Every structure is written in C-alpha cells, then in structure tokens.
Amino acid sequence: MSEKRPLILLPAVDVVEGRAVRLVQGKAGSETEYGSALDAALGWQRDGAEWIHLVDLDAAFGRGSNRELLADVVGRLDVAVELSGGIRDDESLEAALATGCARVNIGTAALENPQWCAKVVAEFGDKVAVGLDVKIVDDQHRLRGRGWETDGGDLWEVLDRLDSEGCSRYVVTDVTKDGTLQGPNLDLLGRVADRTDAPVIASGGVSSLDDLRAIATLTDRGVEGAIVGKALYAGRFTLPEALAAMGQ
C-alpha cells in the first residue's frame, strides 16, 4: 500500500437484552451497562463516526437474540454498520444482511463450519469479514470460538486457509486485551497484517489516543481500522478527540 490512509475508527456497541454493555475479556457476566443500544449508536454517529461496530452478544453466546432491535438500529443510522454476533448459518446471515448493514463479521462459523464460510466468502465478497479472536497460550496463537469459550485451532493455519478462499477482511482481537484498557497487541496486529494481503481491523485493548496513534503506524502494513469500545464509554477520550488525532 503506497498511499497512507487515516485509520478508520469504529465505535463498538455491544448489545445484551437491548442495552449497550462492555465486557472484560469477553466473559459473560462481566458486563458494565451503558444504556440503550440505539442511543449509544446514535450518539457515536452524532460525534462523527463513519462506522459503527454493532454486536449481538446474546446471539454470540447462544442465549437468545436482539435481531429485531439491531435491524431497527441499523435502519435508524446514516453511517455504515459492521454487524457481528451469532452469524453462523444461511438464515442468520440473510437476516443480518437484510438489515442493510455494510458488512457482517463471521467468527465461530469460520472455525466450526469452514465449508459454509468458504461459500459465503465467495458469494458475498466484501460484505463478509472474518473475526479472528486470538488467545496466546505458551507462545501458541490459538483461535477462540463460541463467545471465546472453545478452541478453534491455530491462527496461522486458519488465516492461510481463509486467505486461499479469498476472505476480504479480518477483525483481529487479542481476547486477553479486550475490555481491559491495557493497550492493543501491536505485535499480533502487525504479524497478521504482514501475512495477509487483506485489510485488518484491530480490536481490543485501546485505552488512549497514544494507543490509536500506535495502531495508525501499522496502516502501511495493512491495518485499516480500529474498533474502540471501553475507552470511549469510560471517558478516556472522546470520539471527536480520537478522530482529530487520526487527522479526520
């Protein structure tokens, strides 16, 4: 990539029973609640977001769904939405795409149902991103599925497989960092970006504007955007401050 592009910021709205929440390390039961999901999403739009990362955590954990609410949220927004959580088969994928979201993020299904994932990547192209939720154990990069409860194999093997199938984009999370405000795993992001030609979106750990500036140094290696959640909700910085820091 020759042209230096500003890092795209995607404020996260994680939804449990219709409310915006943040988890610590993706663990069910660690929620901090931040009010209505719709109000949160509209607030980020008002603050200048061009993208919203909208997650149905109930669907991701297999304990229900906020499908109708999320469709309403997408319909009320004028900005692009990346929709994630529990998209594991044709029916849930079609329902997600029918909301009018810009793209969907597939996680567990890419690990548990690789043939289906290959089919939808081929069929829907840029409308499908794959979430790579990584847990580093004894220097092994392992993928996690089912709301990070199950082992999904070796990161590098799965990444090479998805690349060969033409996956258009990856959302990369270090699950030990997510919701902790401990800073992103820049080494992991850089290594994934170097291994694939597809753009990478960073997720997890952002705690400060300096963290965003650090991720932005990886744009020429293929890191396209960063999902920001807890730091915004906890008031570490505002979205306008973050956009200004990214030159937007």
UniProtKB/Swiss-Prot annotation:
Root EC class: isomerase
Subcellular localization: Cytoplasm
Cellular component, GO annotation: cytoplasm
UniProt main location, coarse: cytoplasm
Keyword Cytoplasm assigned: yes
InterPro entries attached to this UniProt entry: Aldolase_TIM (IPR013785), His_biosynth (IPR006062), HisA/PriA_Actinobacteria (IPR010188), Isoase_HisA-like (IPR044524), Isoase_HisA-like_bact (IPR023016), RibuloseP-bd_barrel (IPR011060)
Catalyzed reactions: 1-(5-phospho-beta-D-ribosyl)-5-[(5-phospho-beta-D-ribosylamino)methylideneamino]imidazole-4-carboxamide = 5-[(5-phospho-1-deoxy-D-ribulos-1-ylimino)methylamino]-1-(5-phospho-beta-D-ribosyl)imidazole-4-carboxamide; N-(5-phospho-beta-D-ribosyl)anthranilate = 1-(2-carboxyphenylamino)-1-deoxy-D-ribulose 5-phosphate
EC number annotated for this UniProt entry: 5.3.1.16, 5.3.1.24
Highest rank taxon of the organism: Bacteria
Task of the protein: Involved in both the histidine and tryptophan biosynthetic pathways.
Protein name (Swiss-Prot/TrEMBL): Phosphoribosyl isomerase A
Species of origin: Mycobacterium sp. (strain KMS)
